[in-house]
């Protein structure tokens, strides 16, 4: 195991270790200040973006705030549901619409890899980790 991980884990209380198992669901109407305070005070693992994020400025404000909080020296995880087709929570300029699984199945493996790699890079550039 990574020595840094062991060192950090030893410093966490049982409550903080439990918090590291939780991603809190976040919707576009949530306040970045409220969410970052929750992550910081409860030592949560991070956030899961829910709902339809259509405002790039709201999304960037949330991700900037979350990516700057670091409870106990641990950077939060930012996750979302981005399966393609209708299941795509991030719908902002700069993030391509991912085709449905059915549409991807009709593409060549090289084309699928190119499409999903581009999408993953676009999400990573915004600050989404998973």
List PLM regions with ranges.
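Residue-level signal for the start and early helices of compact helical domains
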Residues: 3-5, 9, 13-15, 35, ...
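Domain-core and long-helix interface of multi-subunit machines
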Residues: 24-30, 35, 41-44
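Boundary/entry segment of secreted carbohydrate-active catalytic domains
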Residues: 1-30, 83
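Enzymes and membrane/adaptor proteins characterized by extended Gly/Ser/Thr/Asp/Glu-rich
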Residues: 37-130
């Amino acid at each position: 195991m990574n020595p840094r991980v062991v060192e950090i884990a030893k410093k966490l209380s049982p409550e903080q270790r439990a918090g590291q198992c939780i991603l809190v669901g976040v919707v576009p109407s949530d306040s970045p200040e409220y969410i970052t305070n929750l992550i910081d005070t409860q030592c949560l693992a991070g956030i899961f973006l829910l709902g339809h994020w259509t405002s790039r400025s709201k999304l960037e404000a949330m991700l900037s705030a979350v990516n700057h909080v670091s409870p106990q020296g641990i950077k939060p995880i930012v996750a979302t549901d981005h399966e393609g087709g209708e299941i795509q929570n991030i719908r902002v300029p700069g993030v391509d619409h991912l085709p449905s699984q059915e549409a991807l199945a009709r593409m060549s493996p090289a084309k699928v890899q190119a499409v999903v790699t581009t999408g993953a890079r676009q999400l990573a550039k915004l600050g989404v980790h998973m």
